[in-house]
A protein has these predicted regions:
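Juxtamembrane "helix-exit" motif on the non-cytosolic side of transmembrane helices
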Residues: 63-71, 126-136, 182-189
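N-terminal topogenic module of multi-pass integral membrane proteins
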Residues: 1-82
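Membrane-proximal helix-loop-helix units in multi-pass membrane proteins
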Residues: 82-161
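Hydrophobic cores of alpha-helical transmembrane segments in multi-pass inner/ER membrane proteins
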Residues: 24-37, 80-98, 147-159, 199-215
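Membrane-helix boundary connector in multi-pass membrane proteins
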Residues: 159-172, 181-194
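Short, charged juxtamembrane terminal tails flanking transmembrane helices
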Residues: 216-221
Length: 221
């Protein structure tokens, strides 16, 4: 009992430096806004060059000082985005720009498993916020042992299925998220905040609903 309590203890959490938090607000939200710019431009039928100009303008706007930038208000309302959301958007932007295709989750079973894991984690954290769980799940996210356990779980699809890193992009991406978190403790010092944020969770729920109606599991757009 004492060993288990020690394993998941949240004493002495590693918190990010204040300067890094401010930098992450601009970099993180700027990346998400740029991704939204490309997506909106594509949906509106803009030429690729025009869509990328829109994305670049949104990224520059995110770096304006004080209340002139959307980051100021987004940070007040939502703090910084998750490392997962930022890396997903950044990878998708790079692949769209280079013509390498869209970000793929791997074999269909694991695509569904990753999607379900994100949705269920969000619901569990919501229940924890409402004090409806017998344990404090969010507090576990401050413990240094939890990321190591989650890395092992993230590599499980790759170990069981084999194949290249490209075939298991999500496993690689999740490990990258943990690497950023362990090195910098972004965005809040809690590993759950590095993996998931409210906007990403809502997006995953929408994807799950759409996949359910379509009767298939797909790729992250």
């Amino acid at each position: 009992m004492n060993a288990a309590a020690s394993l998941f203890s949240a004493d002495n959490p590693g918190l990010p430096a204040l300067g890094l938090v401010q930098l992450w607000l601009h970099l993180g939200w700027g990346t998400l806004l740029a991704w939204l710019g490309v997506r909106m431009g594509t949906r509106l039928g803009l030429q690729p060059r025009a869509a990328w100009v829109l994305a670049s303008a949104l990224m520059v706007w995110a770096w304006l000082p004080g209340p002139y930038a959307p980051v100021h208000w987004l940070g007040l309302a939502f703090q910084g985005p998750s490392v997962m959301a930022v890396l997903l958007c950044a990878v998708d932007l790079v692949w769209r720009r280079t013509g390498s295709g869209r970000f793929r989750e791997g074999p269909s079973f694991w695509s569904g498993a990753w999607l379900a894991a994100g949705v269920l984690l969000g619901w569990a954290l919501l229940l924890d916020t409402l004090a409806l769980l017998p344990v404090s799940l969010y507090a576990w996210g401050f413990n240094a042992a939890v990321p190591a356990l989650l890395v092992l779980l993230a590599l499980l699809p790759w170990v069981l299925q084999g194949g290249s890193a490209r075939q298991h992009s999500m496993s690689v991406l999740v490990v990258a998220v943990f690497a950023v978190y362990v090195a910098l403790h972004l965005p809040t010092g809690n590993v759950w905040d590095a993996l998931l944020d409210p906007w990403l969770w809502l997006y995953l729920n929408a994807r799950a609903v759409r996949a359910g109606f379509a009767g298939r599991r797909g790729v992250l757009p």
